């Protein structure tokens, strides 16, 4: 299955996967509104040899078939300062 991948300027690491390039009919309007203007990144073969970096190819393919799209959320970044504060608080 070939899919089109789009990114947004609003949130680093957030990507929208749809079955056909430019066909956003199955994406809820509220999601498109919060996503902003989609910026095309590439076409990707989910059934091919290459794997997505931050998502499972089979999961993405299944979500696109069921819902018409897949939304990849950005990974949460570690807050090292907060971790250090918690460590110091509990190890006085």
Curated annotation (Swiss-Prot):
PROSITE patterns: YCGL. InterPro entries: YcgL-like_sf, YcgL_dom. Residues 1-85 form the YcgL domain. This is YcgL domain-containing protein HSM_1274. It comes from Histophilus somni (strain 2336) (Haemophilus somnus). The lineage of its organism: Bacteria, Pseudomonadati, Pseudomonadota, Gammaproteobacteria, Pasteurellales.
